[in-house]
Swiss-Prot record:
Gene: rpsL
Function: With S4 and S5 plays an important role in translational accuracy.
Originating species: Caulobacter vibrioides (strain NA1000 / CB15N) (Caulobacter crescentus)
Subunit field text: Part of the 30S ribosomal subunit. Contacts proteins S8 and S17. May interact with IF1 in the 30S initiation complex.
Modified residues (3-methylthioaspartic acid): D89
Protein name, per record: Small ribosomal subunit protein uS12
Length: 123
């Protein structure tokens, strides 16, 4: 524990703020090309096959991104738009792919929360 005098001489330095989405370089979204589309399994209490894609961004960075919703049409060389937002039970997945934008189709037969999944209003 420092003395008051030591703190006056050299005050405490604030902890540096760590960027949670470095690949976006301060932008809300970024465009990229899928280099690999695959499934992976989540951390311990959960069990599933989560759909993820490795994306090479326009910044030149490769990021692992989650594909939300049921079913998707992504394959290698698909052009996608990604946003920040991690997946809690997938380590290393810090980005989400936006549905219904560029080469990604919206989720079929989606009735609620449609805007998040790029689904049109049902007739």
């Amino acid at each position: 524990m420092p003395t008051i005098n030591q703190l006056i001489r050299k005050p405490r330095s604030p902890k540096p703020v760590r960027n949670k989405v470095p690949a976006l370089k301060g932008c809300p979204q970024r465009r990229g090309v899928c280099t690999r589309v695959y499934t992976t399994t989540p951390k311990k209490p959960n069990s599933a096959l989560r759909k993820v894609a490795k994306v090479r961004l326009t910044t030149g960075i490769e990021a692992v991104c989650y594909i939300p919703g049921e079913g998707h049409n992504l394959q290698e060389h698909s052009v996608v738009l990604i946003r920040g937002g991690r997946v809690k039970d997938l380590p290393g997945v810090r980005y989400h792919i936006l549905r219904g934008v560029l080469d990604t189709q919206g989720v079929k037969d989606r009735k609620q929360r449609r805007s998040l999944y790029g689904a049109k209003r049902p007739k």
